[in-house]
Amino acid sequence: MLCYVNYKRVKRPVEIPNLEVEIGFGRGDFIVKLAKENPDKNFFGIEISQISIEKLMKRVGKKGLKNVYCTNVDAYWGFYFLFRDNYVENIYMNYPDPWFKKRHHKRRLTKPERLYMFAKKLKLGGEIRIRTDNYEFLEFTKESAKVLDCFEVEEGTLNVKEPLTKYEQKWLSMGKTLYKLILRKVKEPKFVEHPEVEEVRELFPVKVKVESVDPKKIESREIKLDEEVYFKTFKVWQRDKDFLVECLLSEKGYLQKFFIQIKRKEDGYVIDVSPYSEVLRTRNLQRSIQTVAQLLS
């Protein structure tokens, strides 16, 4: 398996033994250090920044590391799609965004439904190890852990001889207090309502019997398909009698950007996801195709 794991294409759940995961690896200093010091283990980085992904891949290639993997996706969905329950040995979160404003707390990495997903995938005895410079974030995380009732909690201030990153080194040199929180899984978490998407084996094109296509009917539309499920269209391109529609689907926070093609056939048009769009096949993606067909009918 290559360093970069395309979660939409790879066989899931992944089969990578002795696996530890870092969420939000940034420059990649920590995950590379772990991989070099522990050649008998495998390390998986999950990161939403494409630039960070590319930088890590270059570093891994230059150092010849064979035990580092990464993917470009939101951490919750990375765990949801890629790992089976009780599989990951340890999870690392180094200075996650604390999202200071109260109205943004729902974006925090350790809100209960996200922490629930991480706990489900963590082995019994495994640990979620968090470093933060924000004490309020630490307290928030402890409250989320209480909801799940599956962790032994250990906390304290950091006193490190070897900083993980240049930022940690800078903060320590400034005398800033840094905190650590270890959540050790001792039993299965209590159930918490959490986002899910329904995958399907295949997507089916939809045929509409119309003489012509009016782009204004489908351009710049926003349609609610279900609770917390929204389908948006943007620009429409035309080439001869065929069309290409720029689209976005948001399912419980899981985002997919793709194109829908509208191709002329003898007695109408066939609507399908463009073969150049890489998508995760979901029930709501099929509904998106059907929605475009309805707009044209």
From Swiss-Prot:
It comes from Aquifex aeolicus (strain VF5). Substrate binds at residues 101, 133, 165-168. The gene is trmB. The lineage of its organism: Bacteria, Pseudomonadati, Aquificota, Aquificia, Aquificales. Belongs to the class I-like SAM-binding methyltransferase superfamily. TrmB family. GO terms for cellular component: tRNA methyltransferase complex. This is tRNA (guanine-N(7)-)-methyltransferase. Catalyzes the formation of N(7)-methylguanine at position 46 (m7G46) in tRNA. It holds the Pfam family Methyltransf_4. One of its GO terms (biological process) is tRNA methylation. GO terms for molecular function: tRNA (guanine(46)-N7)-methyltransferase activity. Pathway: tRNA modification; N(7)-methylguanine-tRNA biosynthesis.
